[in-house]
Amino acid sequence: MKLTRRVTIWILTAVGAVALGACGAKSPPDSSAPTTLTMRAAAPSLTIGVPLTMIANRTDKAHGITVDLQAFGTSSTISIDAVLAGQAMFGSVGTLTALQAIRQGADLRIIAAVVNNVQMMVIRNDVGQRLGVSPTAPIAERVRALKGLTVATGAVGSTHYQILRSYLRQYGLNPDTDVRLIGIAEPSALVSGIEQRRFDAIAYASPLVEHAIARGAGQVWISGPRGDIPGSDNIKTGLIVVRAETIEKNRDQVEALRAALTDALRAVQSERVATGQKLHGMYFANLEGGVWETAWDATTTAYPANLAFTRQAYDYWITNDPKGAESYRNVDYAQITYDRAQSQ
């Protein structure tokens, strides 16, 4: 029996809401049809490049499942809430947001890490000129030059928000007093804000901030993907989480998703030209080709070798939590991390 599928991904990009899908009338289900599972995520960016590649290449179907990826906004909290409420089986979320939810009692498990650091900071052209610091100056000079500026990033408390705070502290700035940080829950507001001169700089996942470059509003100031900040290149900024009971009751589906993500990760690493072209066409077509290629090429080392959420990355994030590592004294890395996703 032939099954026609309906898969709809709602995407909120920097230019508005776009619905992408393959639609058709559904036939009655049969036992050989792939199981449809929902994954919630923030708006498409290279933070979720591996899940996007899984959808683009349909590696999920190769492992007996069909993933309905619903992606919008900038807050991982919404995705976590959907997982906890049973509205989604999987959440593709920011690492710190996931860990904070677990610390607060959310019965979640980390089954995969899908990206390292893809945060980019773009500074307004006129601000860069006024500072008198070159965008190729030593990173310490570029970070310290942010003193007194207004910088917008992801929602307050989000992974992007905390990455930025850690950069500032690393180079001697107080993120609460030396820089005016603004958390934004709507990704398109980052680009429009820098265009309208409300922000001096914006920091978020590539390639969303590159829209500001494409529109002539700014230039790259700090690049996580190219390793500008020492020690931040392997910190696992994006995770896949599930409820603990999902592992107990649906381990086969968890394993199927991990296998599909592994295939997608291999494509990201070894088939970069073809994968980049496909992602550009499906999710980032409104980004001019040259700008997209620059953003994609910069992520060569931004994706991990495997899906492990390392103990090293865990230690990094709990140390950079605003409440400190001590607030995780009742959290056990080995318990919250799926056994096959653990590594030093």
Over which residues does each language-model region extend?
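Bacterial N-terminal signal peptides that target proteins for export
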Residues: 1-11
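Conserved C-terminal helix/tail region of periplasmic/extracytoplasmic solute-binding proteins
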Residues: 318-344
